Every structure is written in C-alpha cells, then in structure tokens.
C-alpha cells in the first residue's frame, strides 16, 4: 500500500466526515463495500469504537457520540443504542479483531481495488 498521505489528498475535515459515514454504515449494516484502502483505514476506526463501546461508561458514550452520526437509522434503529446494546456485547470476550476485509474484483469504471469490510 502506498503512503496514505499520498492516497488521500483531502483535508482532515473531509477524511473525518467520510470515515464517520463509513463507520456508521458498517455498524448499522454489518458489512459495506468500499475501496481496499478505505477499508484498511476504516478497520482501525471501527475497532477503536467497538473497544470503547465495550467499556459502556459515560465517557465512552460521549466519545463515540462525538464521532458517529448518532441519529442515522436503519429501519428505525438508532446507531448509538444499537452499538452499545447489540454490537459491543457480541465482542465482550474478544480482544480486538472485530472486522474482516475480503477482497473482491476491481471496480469496472476506474479499476480501483475493492473490498468488503464486515463485522466478524
């Protein structure tokens, strides 16, 4: 993988918004399809969020709420309660490694390497 600073030539605000959106979608849906480089960077973001959610204290809730889109829903399910009540309890006995990256064929339009990132 090339230097990440050369891959993403956007400002920090753009990076933050993209990875907020990707992390929120991954938590709600369990898997998403994205480019391989974004999947690799998203893995560290999501694993840190799940580790914080496992603590389940007020400080962890506030830190996660400041990062995720808390009001985004899927079929009426809000992401914050879903993360703390459904996702985090699944990984109480697991120390990291909450995600899996599966490579898929390249995108036809620009031949970008694609991957599916999913919660284990």
UniProtKB/Swiss-Prot annotation:
It comes from the Bacteria. One of its GO terms (cellular component) is cytosolic large ribosomal subunit. Pfam families: Ribosomal_L17. InterPro entries: Ribosomal_bL17, Ribosomal_bL17_CS, Ribosomal_bL17_sf. One of its GO terms (biological process) is translation. Keywords: Ribonucleoprotein, Ribosomal protein. GO terms for molecular function: structural constituent of ribosome. Belongs to the bacterial ribosomal protein bL17 family. Part of the 50S ribosomal subunit. Contacts protein L32. PANTHER family: LARGE RIBOSOMAL SUBUNIT PROTEIN BL17M, RIBOSOMAL PROTEIN L17. This is Large ribosomal subunit protein bL17. The gene is rplQ.
């Amino acid at each position: 993988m090339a230097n990440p600073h050369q891959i993403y030539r956007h400002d920090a605000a753009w990076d933050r918004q993209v990875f907020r959106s990707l992390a929120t979608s991954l938590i709600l849906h369990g898997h998403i399809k994205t480019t391989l480089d974004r999947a690799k960077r998203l893995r560290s973001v999501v694993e840190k969020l799940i580790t914080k959610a496992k603590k389940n204290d007020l400080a962890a809730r506030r830190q996660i709420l400041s990062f995720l889109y808390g009001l985004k829903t899927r079929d009426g399910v809000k992401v914050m309660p879903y993360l703390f009540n459904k996702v985090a309890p699944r990984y109480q006995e697991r120390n990291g490694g909450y995600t899996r990256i599966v490579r898929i064929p390249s995108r036809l339009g620009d031949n970008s390497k694609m991957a599916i990132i999913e919660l284990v």
